[in-house]
Amino acid sequence: MLKQVGDGVWVRQSGWVWSNSTVVRTDDGLVLVDPGISGAELGALADEVDRLGVPVVAGFSTHPHFDHLLWHSRFGDVPRYATAGCARVATEGREQAQVMAVETAEDVPVELVALVSPLPAGGGPVPGEIIEHDGHAVGHAAVLLADHGVLLVGDMLSDVLIPMLDVGRPGQLDAYEAALGRLEEAVRRVDVVVPGHGAVAERAEVAARLTADRAYLEALRRREEPVDVRMEQDWMMGPHQRNLQALLD
């Protein structure tokens, strides 16, 4: 079910890794950010979007991981955007993203996965300010909707996921820490932060998430075992081990 988190901003959470789809109302229509995950959930999101009575005019993907590159035909044949870096990686890795989507979620419209284009100068129909960084993935974007009091941060600042480095690329600790610094500045301009996975946070709650993420990264840098409540989930050990391996490669 869509939950309003700001003026003209709604979030729907998936049962898969607490993934958040965001709907933003603009003067021209609705923009969907990272809609997902299963075919049934995408269809339910389409039902709720229909009830808003406003047409979808665009989509936006915050980064080039499969669960942020999904779409449904009922949203319409409208432009779907990403940063130039994200669009390039998504296009090059489209086949792999399709495979991962099929293996992970039921009835995903595979033919619509990863069909994103570089965002035009000025943002086109996508509202707000795009904050691009290289933490977590190439061309990762946060969307600062200052007029709505909301910041969409993609796969950052989660209460359920540890920081996940972009394995295979050098300098990821520095890149992730720099990204956190930029997001910290943006948080001061909003009331609500929407992560790609996990609970929507009020501004006062975000400081604890920033502290937790920085403590985790510092433990990695020191080659120490992090003390992080998020790692009490057994399945978080896989991402943690990949982070460790990334620092050794």
Give, region by region, the residue ranges found by the protein language model.
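Accessory terminal helices/loops
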Residues: 184-192, 199-249
